[in-house]
Curated annotation (Swiss-Prot):
Induction: Expression is positively regulated by the trichothecene cluster-specific transcription activator TRI10.
Name of the featured protein: Core trichothecene cluster (CTC) protein 14
Family to which this protein belongs: Belongs to the TRI14 family.
Function (record text): Part of the core gene cluster that mediates the biosynthesis of trichothecenes, a very large family of chemically related bicyclic sesquiterpene compounds acting as mycotoxins, including T2-toxin. The biosynthesis of trichothecenes begins with the cyclization of farnesyl diphosphate to trichodiene and is catalyzed by the trichodiene synthase TRI5. Trichodiene undergoes a series of oxygenations catalyzed by the cytochrome P450 monooxygenase TRI4.
Length: 373
């Protein structure tokens, strides 16, 4: 832990950084939601174990996917209170046992977009695909649709075809289609608004053995970005293609990863910054967030700016996303009987990394800030 005088100094630099960004119109729009206070937030729910969240800019709440019990909670970060929790009949469960029900809640998106959210889509995946290291891809895996006015399930679409699975994330493409990403073998499904499913991409061979491949997914323009943990590279697809063709994104300097998870383009930085959560690294056993930049927003190649380690211990970093005007890291505690089940935790800190990101993205403002302190 840093001495308070250093923390105060960093806070002053961070405030100056935020002022610099705002004056230079670097920040993207954050909608009508009021700003959140600086500092970490606490997501309090018994056995919640969050993996990621989606920010509703219409209602100013977050929808949090509770991994181990396959539920989704509506959370008000301003009041630090869980408003409700959506349970899926026949799918959601207690979470403290992976037998007979190993289902998870993972990828989560808003339709038609975060500003006019009417429908929530959630991936309910078979955790056994991950526990078995890709051997069991039998499913079931579902894409659930929920009416945000009534909180009722309006659609339950089975994703799995028995050949490849490991579904862990989803993203809404610029073409209006939902893209669901699988890990074993690396694959991407395209789901139309009419719930028609096609395979946009699948890596050969189908296995087994199946290696830990694609994980997170995010869109910027017509580009779809995913991390390939097998080769430790960021991969780019063009959603305008009928069938996806993977293209490796050049990194300068190269940053190796093997446990990348959720990806995110924060609106705060006008889609010029890509955040990649990493569960763990050789240097940081509890993971953190790698930061990439492309000022052109094309993401044909990126500059690796650095890595922000998680401040939590005994937890795996799973995602880093924007909520209102700030960026938070979500980490999954590993206090269960094993990695496949929930423990007894009731409080889950969301780490605020906004100031650290601001300074990393434009380090030259440190000198300007110090002159003002």
């Amino acid at each position: 832990m840093l001495p308070q005088v250093i923390l105060n100094h960093l806070g002053s630099i961070g405030e100056a950084a935020s002022t610099w960004f705002s004056e230079n119109k670097y920040f993207g729009s954050v909608g009508q939601c009021p700003p959140l206070p600086k500092g970490d937030l606490n997501y309090d729910i018994y056995m919640g174990y969050p993996e990621m969240f989606a920010w509703d800019k219409k209602r100013c709440v977050a929808y949090v996917s509770n991994l181990y019990n396959a539920t989704v909670s509506t959370w008000d970060p301003y009041k630090s209170v869980v408003l409700d929790t959506i349970h899926f009949p026949g799918l959601s469960h207690a979470g403290n046992s992976a037998s007979p029900n190993p289902l998870h809640a993972s990828g989560i998106i808003l339709r038609p977009d975060a500003y006019h959210a009417e429908t929530l889509e959630v991936v309910i995946d078979n955790g056994d695909a991950f526990y078995s290291d890709g051997f069991n891809v039998s499913g079931p895996d579902h894409l659930m649709s929920i009416d945000l006015k009534t909180k009722e399930v309006t659609s339950q679409l089975r994703l799995n075809n028995g050949l490849y699975a490991g579904y862990a994330d989803a993203s809404l493409g610029p073409d209006g289609n939902t893209y669901v990403l699988g890990t074993y073998s690396s694959n991407i499904l395209r789901v139309t608004p009419d719930k028609e499913i096609s395979t946009f991409y699948v890596a050969e061979p189908l296995g087994p053995p199946r290696l830990y491949g694609f994980t997170g997914i995010a869109h910027v323009g017509d580009a779809m970005i995913v991390p390939d943990n097998i080769i430790g590279q960021l991969i780019r697809f063009d959603v305008r293609d009928k069938v996806g063709t993977p293209v490796t994104i050049k990194q300068t300097p190269y940053h190796e990863f093997k446990t990348a998870n959720v990806l995110h383009f924060p609106e705060r930085y006008n889609d010029t910054i890509l955040l990649v959560a990493e569960n763990m690294t050789p240097d940081y056993p509890y993971g953190g967030v790698s930061v990439y930049q492309d000022k052109t927003k094309q993401f044909n190649e990126v500059e690796f700016l650095g890595f922000l380690p998680s401040r939590l211990t005994n937890a795996l970093t799973t995602s880093a996303r924007q909520m209102a005007d700030r960026i938070y890291v979500v980490a999954l505690p590993t206090d269960g009987a094993n990695i496949t089940v929930a423990g007894e935790s009731s409080r889950f800190p969301f780490q605020d990394i906004t100031e650290e990101l601001d300074l990393m993205i434009l380090p030259e403002i440190k000198d300007e800030a110090r002159d003002e302190i």
